[in-house]
């Protein structure tokens, strides 16, 4: 990736486009870690002093490294608080990110390294107070630092406490990733993948461990393998302060921070009100501590400068030393250096000989490389480039160059060149480069970083594996959730489809019934008209027959009367005519009455039969309505039964899917735990082999070094023998002179012979004692070395055995906890499935009861309506005078 070019346009605004190598000059390494290196630098544009953190994102895990850089930059951009490091920008150059921040003097762990003793309680309280304020700010914005330790708590010149290194931070709370530094990790972080999530309370635990670190120089379990420390933290009780010199307030604060259960652990705001950080303390406590540390660092660096300058001058005068000379001078120099450091340590509490020796060895190596080049200019440049203001310049050979104006050599052949003098003047005038970290400490960090690369890779690989396992679990959970959502959506669509189909079927049934009713009504109307027409036609026929019968009867009666009158000759014709007319009128009247009566009977018959026909039609319509409602209710019942069968089938399929998904999730979790445990075991075995190799290498070096040590001790015994011989020789001379003076001259020869024999005998005894001392020393040293090495081997075996047992116990606990978690998940699922099935069955029962109730009510309402309709019809018939209509027998069948 070229400078300033970001492939992702969403992240382009995170980085500055300028070339960082042109902007930031005078880079000096001031720290080293797994991410890379931190440099002191000057902004050439603003002349501002900054710290530059270089992070490479090339090589293995390139994408993961790039994402970590993106996350840290985004996190830093959001921070605006006096107790968090100030972010100034980020640049890209040759697959390296330059993260620019404000410059701080050093970290709280540097104080411990420089003074080689714990901090005072008031100093710990001041540092803790500042760190707590930064944590309270983070936690109030749902952020988690996740890597609180003394090395990530920085100090500025005015004594301001700053939280730094947000590479492990999280912008979401709760979180569940396995990140942080092992010895400071909270138990819930170690168990994050196995048991669930954590929140900002993990920073409180790390702060408690940091307090112990500041009070005891190292965090708890620091003498243990980092992996073993993880297992120990996860299953053992919380650590406490070991010494009784601390106040109850401090002890209570630490115990409060290190509550095993997160819910019992206090929040950062609550801790800010604790007496330990709230009580009164001197305002300049941190400023004074920083000043003392700077003075101690300056003294140590000056001592290192004088030591290296002496070596350079000796080599420039005497040339290369042979091996024996180097050994002797190394021994003498080590003795004198130890005396110097002991004296200096009692006054200034600065690092012990071990630290300076490490720096010495690295510096000597680099100087020897310079000497082998044969360039006097390079030698002069090195000897005159030590910075009096504790500035650090990191070369590729790990030499930290200092400029010391007070150590100019008057000899012209050893003075630096003009260019070197100007460079020294440049560093001498740059007084702003103040630090509380010595050059030897930075050198040691670099060497430790190189030497512990295998262990660091193992730990980073373990963290990466845990994070990868977490990602796999989350991916599977998301996949299963999507599958379940899809399944539920499918079931929901099936239910909706069934409901729509049922509604359509009922609507079709309703339409069909409506059409049938309409058709029946039309048929009934047609039948009624046909029935009426039949009655009318019959009545017309009857009326015609009746009229014809009347006509015949009229004629018969008329003829009969005429015959009777014709037989009666006595009656006058006129009277006969009157009688015939009167009889004709009476007959016509009678026939008219009979016709009217017939018409009345026909009309009554017509109306009554029409009424009866309407009643029959109404009863038939009622039967059709009953049939329709029976059909509709049966249809609804069938649909509801089909719906219930579908719901039960869906519940069964959901149950099978849930059990299958839980089985898949638990199987993956167990597979990952087995893989994790296998990796942990392999790491432990690899660590055991490495420790055994290191111990074997150490013993081999001791065996190789033993002849040299024995030679030194033999020389000491030889010197003692020589001194004794000299004393005896002096005593012999004194005794000889005395006896010669007090004895006659004739006895001198005898006395001299006697004294000579005595001297020879005593020297022979001394020689025998010398040989015996040498042999005893040889035997005792060999035996002592064998016993010491055997004791070391035994101690290492015991330690490794304890760590292996601790690992086995931890893995057994994790396995048991996981199995218990799986059992709880299975029980929870069974309860959920059982409860859901019970709710479904209850719902089905309630719906069936509601359906039966609806059926009964609708049939009841139908019968009541039909009865009212018939009753109304019959009442109307009664009012119309049809009281003798045939009563319709209603069906007694109850469809309920």
From Swiss-Prot:
Tagged with keyword Amino-acid biosynthesis: no
Taxonomy, superkingdom: Eukaryota
Residue ranges annotated for the Protein kinase domain, each copy included: 24-277
GO molecular function: ATP binding; protein serine kinase activity; protein serine/threonine kinase activity
Residue stretches of biased makeup (Polar residues): 334-348
An example Gene Ontology biological process: DNA repair
Assigned keywords, A-Z: ATP-binding, Cell membrane, Coiled coil, Cytoplasm, DNA damage, DNA repair, Kinase, Lipid droplet, Membrane, Nucleotide-binding, Serine/threonine-protein kinase, Transferase
Subcellular location: Cytoplasm; Cell membrane; Membrane raft; Lipid droplet
Compositionally biased intervals (Low complexity): 349-366
Binding site residues for ATP: 30-38, 53
SMART domains for the chain: S_TKc (SM00220)
Record's catalysed reaction(s): L-seryl-[protein] + ATP = O-phospho-L-seryl-[protein] + ADP + H(+); L-threonyl-[protein] + ATP = O-phospho-L-threonyl-[protein] + ADP + H(+)
UniProt region (Disordered), positions on chain: 316-366, 403-423, 565-593
Top EC group: transferase
Membrane protein topology class: Peripheral membrane protein
Residues forming coiled coils: 450-513, 545-650, 752-873
GO CC annotation: cytoplasm
InterPro entries named among the record's database cross-references: Kinase-like_dom_sf, Prot_kinase_dom, Protein_kinase_ATP_BS, Ser/Thr_kinase_AS, TAO_STE20_kinase
Enzyme Commission identifier(s): 2.7.11.1
Similarity comment text for this entry: Belongs to the protein kinase superfamily. STE Ser/Thr protein kinase family. STE20 subfamily.
Protein name: Serine/threonine-protein kinase TAO3
Organism for this UniProt entry: Xenopus laevis (African clawed frog)
GN (gene name): taok3
